[in-house]
Amino acid sequence: TQAWLKHFRDAGVRAVGFGWIFIRDIGDAPSELTFETLDQPFTDPLGPEVEEYFTRMDWLRGSTQEDILESRYAVRPGIALEDVSLADADSGMGFTPKVKRLTRTDGPRFTHDIDDAVASIVSGLNPAGLPLREIVSLWAAANGLADEQEEKLASEAAGIIVDLIRHG
């Protein structure tokens, strides 16, 4: 151990990263490679997260965009909606909103920066409620979007939901 520490010190090494590799046979399906940077604190053990991840990916692999939009979802317990504001330096008083994000408070603690529209849509998710497409449609109607804008929003929402599912 001391020899390695001396080698690192002599070589100017300031940090050593550790990682995980999870491999699963998905049969004849096209190979999938996902690389994640876990530079945030996380909660051990990550083993249960790996199995959940593979389950989520199996579902996503078999789902089309239409399937995503016609499905109903639950927000995972422990998800935090964070609104971060910083002191307003221009006015010298109060705060200015800077970022809104969804953050897992368990496992790998993934975080996603989102906007108000995504926050509203995710807030409407309920496994016994409306499918994603209808939640998007309601949001679009409430915000005066034209049909083509609603279709674009639905497509974008499906992609965002896929990313959120991927991260649990």
Predicted regions and their residues:
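Long, charge-rich, low-complexity alpha-helical segments
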Residues: 23, 107-168
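Rossmann-like AdoMet/SAM-dependent catalytic core
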Residues: 1-126
